[in-house]
Amino acid sequence: MKTLLLTLVVVTIVYLDLGYTTKCYNHQSTTPETTEICPDSGYFCYKSSWIDGREGRIERGCTFTCPELTPNGKYVYCCRRDKCNQ
């Protein structure tokens, strides 16, 4: 009986993936592609883009709250899946 209970607990942990953390891209527009693991499961991946002079800039990473859109021409995209901010 104890073995069955232990097996059910292990299977539950594996399928629920307790302690899951999100993996996000964190490179800027001019650097090679890199990723980071967000510190907690409540985090979003974000991608922020804007025009700086004549060049487009992109910033990526993890954030606990999705940044609000601002009227300064900055575009922000948030998501919660692994590497969804490419």
Swiss-Prot record:
Keyword Secreted part of the UniProt annotation: yes
Tissue-specific expression: Expressed by the venom gland.
Disulfide bonds: 24-45, 38-62, 66-78, 79-84
Keywords for this protein: Acetylcholine receptor inhibiting toxin, Disulfide bond, Ion channel impairing toxin, Neurotoxin, Postsynaptic neurotoxin, Secreted, Signal, Toxin
Disulfide bond listed as a keyword: yes
Signal peptide: 1-21
Cellular component terms (Gene Ontology): extracellular region
Molecular function via GO: acetylcholine receptor inhibitor activity; ion channel regulator activity; toxin activity
Location relative to the cell: Secreted
The protein's role, per its UniProt record: Antagonist of muscle (alpha-1-beta-1-delta-epsilon/CHRNA1-CHRNB1-CHRND-CHRNE) and neuronal (alpha-7/CHRNA7, alpha-3-beta-2/CHRNA3-CHRNB2, alpha-4-beta-2/CHRNA4-CHRNB2) nicotinic acetylcholine receptors (nAChR). The highest affinity is for human alpha-7/CHRNA7 nAChRs (IC(50)=180 nM), compared to human alpha-1-beta-1-delta-epsilon/CHRNA1-CHRNB1-CHRND-CHRNE nAChR (IC(50)= 550 nM), alpha-3-beta-2/CHRNA3-CHRNB2 nAChR (IC(50)=500 nM), and alpha-4-beta-2/CHRNA4-CHRNB2 nAChR (IC(50)=2.6 uM).
Family per similarity comment: Belongs to the three-finger toxin family. Short-chain subfamily. Orphan group VIII (haditoxin) sub-subfamily.
Known partners and oligomeric status: Homodimer; non-covalently linked.
Stated name of the protein: Haditoxin
Organism: Ophiophagus hannah (King cobra)
